[in-house]
């Protein structure tokens, strides 16, 4: 479980001092809870996010424990370093909006026909309760030929999960190389 510290002061000077000490500024918020301003050690946070198996993960700030999902993050445009993260605290049985990653498997047939695999969307917006949240959508791209694509409506349907993106949006496809 990730452990962080609660920020007593939310001033700019305090944030700069924490960043200088290797901390990542974070906000935890959600339906029915008071916003918590916190900070996590940057490197352990990134390592934990890369190793986690589920979208929802536990964090501890002070003496409070939250089940959270990364809602939004900000990176430094020059160094590409993570500088801020918003964590949405989830409550079982309460529907929320999430962004679920799309993973693909297989090698498209169209690559042999001088095509290029084009990822149009990396994440799909869904609305559901946290206990029904899929960890990812897996797309098999092996049957795709040149000028073919997989649309949102072609994704597998999960029970109690509503996809918010329009069903005619392309998720992944193979285009002809020029």
From Swiss-Prot:
The keyword Cytoplasm does not apply. Keywords: Ribonucleoprotein, Ribosomal protein, RNA-binding, rRNA-binding. One of its GO terms (molecular function) is structural constituent of ribosome. The keyword Ribonucleoprotein applies. It comes from the Bacteria. It comes from Helicobacter pylori (strain ATCC 700392 / 26695). This is one of the proteins that binds to the 5S RNA in the ribosome where it forms part of the central protuberance. GO terms for cellular component: cytosolic large ribosomal subunit. One of its GO terms (biological process) is translation. It holds the Pfam family Ribosomal_TL5_C. Part of the 50S ribosomal subunit; part of the 5S rRNA/L5/L18/L25 subcomplex. Contacts the 5S rRNA. Binds to the 5S rRNA independently of L5 and L18. Belongs to the bacterial ribosomal protein bL25 family. CTC subfamily. This is Large ribosomal subunit protein bL25. HAMAP family: Ribosomal_bL25_CTC.
